[in-house]
Design a protein with these regions (language model features):
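N-terminal beta-loop-helix "entrance" segment that forms/cooperates
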Residues: 44-56
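Short, conserved beta-strand edge motifs with alternating hydrophobic and charged residues
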Residues: 5-7, 37-41
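Short beta-alpha junction loops
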Residues: 42-45, 81-84
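Short, glycine-rich nucleotide/cofactor-binding loops
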Residues: 5-20, 52-53
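Low-complexity intrinsically disordered segments
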Residues: 84, 96-118
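Histidine-anchored nucleotide/phosphate-binding helix
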Residues: 17-38
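Residues at the starts of beta-strands that form the adenosine-phosphate
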Residues: 2, 34-37, 76
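A glycine-rich helix N-cap at a beta->alpha junction
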Residues: 54-81
Length: 119
């Protein structure tokens, strides 16, 4: 894997996750899908939670844009099982499919990337 995108921050309160998603989608123009990996850990798993109502916070709904990962054929998607447990979330509650892996496995996979972008 060439590029890893690591989402660690919650979706609202700042623009970090939205900017990370924009960077991820832009990277697909320059890299093959197989060269890109996406990871969600800590508060970053909240970016994948279905049924959010950002308009109540006067925020734009960019969360649905994560569904474009299917359209862009980005299949290497991983979510930290420990982080899901922290929020009592199940894979069925996420807007996209992602492989659940433990924190140690996630860190091992991240170490294989040439570049890691953290958001």
């Amino acid at each position: 894997m060439k590029l890893a995108f690591l989402f660690r921050t919650a979706p609202y309160g700042n623009a970090i996750s939205r900017e990370g998603l924009d960077a991820l989608l832009a990277a697909t123009a320059f890299c093959d899908e197989e060269e890109i990996c996406v990871f969600f850990i800590d508060d970053g798993v909240l970016n994948l939670l279905d049924g959010q109502k950002p308009e109540l916070l006067l925020q734009k709904d960019f969360i649905r844009t994560f569904k474009l990962l299917d359209l862009y054929d980005i299949e290497q998607r991983f979510v930290c099982a420990d982080s899901l447990d922290q929020y009592n979330l199940q894979a069925e509650q996420l807007i996209i499919s992602a492989e659940k892996i433990d924190r140690t496995s996630l860190i091992n996979k991240l170490s294989q990337a040439e570049k890691v972008f953290t958001f």
